[in-house]
């Protein structure tokens, strides 16, 4: 199975937990306990049955994966990405996007000058932050708000940025 545009990243396994095969997962769902609620998860090669044991801080969960029964097996899953078919997810409003949909979008200034490419979307607790890699090789971060990103066109895979005044160098 290949991971393509029809799959959405819901989480990443970042550590083993305990000796009975549990793992810690950084989730990208609104409610971390929903990581396994949308349907079968896959890493691209196999389907994984995930059961959430507990929610811990910063959008993370401790989970059990069927067939993983010891710490060594759990440690082997570190950095494994967990995806779900987008057809299993709820429909979004017009101004909502999944993180994976934004990564790779071309970013332009209002005058159509290329500003860069979206390389990552973070959420440190106070809102989404978009990381953009510029043609000069710099990485810039901006709050993901409608004032800064007034236009997003998923058909053309482009978004418009109006950088805040304090960034001055982009005028």
From Swiss-Prot:
Function statement:
An accessory protein needed during the final step in the assembly of 30S ribosomal subunit, possibly for assembly of the head region. Essential for efficient processing of 16S rRNA. May be needed both before and after RbfA during the maturation of 16S rRNA. It has affinity for free ribosomal 30S subunits but not for 70S ribosomes.
Mind telling me which HAMAP family this protein's record contains? Answer: Ribosome_mat_RimM
Give the record's GO biological process terms: ribosomal small subunit biogenesis; rRNA processing
Description of how the protein assembles with itself and partners:
Binds ribosomal protein uS19.
Please name the gene that encodes this protein: rimM
Compartment list? Cytoplasm
What's the protein name? Answer: Ribosome maturation factor RimM
Q: Name one Pfam family in it.
A: PRC_RimM
Q: Which UniProt keywords apply?
A: Chaperone, Cytoplasm, Ribosome biogenesis, rRNA processing
SUPFAM superfamilies associated with the record: PRC-barrel domain, Translation proteins
Kindly indicate whether the keyword rRNA processing belongs to this entry: yes
Q: Residues in domain PRC barrel? A: 94-168
| Single GO molecular function | ribosome binding
Q: What is known of its domains?
A: The PRC barrel domain binds ribosomal protein uS19.
Describe the family membership recorded for this protein in Swiss-Prot or TrEMBL: Belongs to the RimM family.
Q: So which domain of life are we looking at?
A: Bacteria
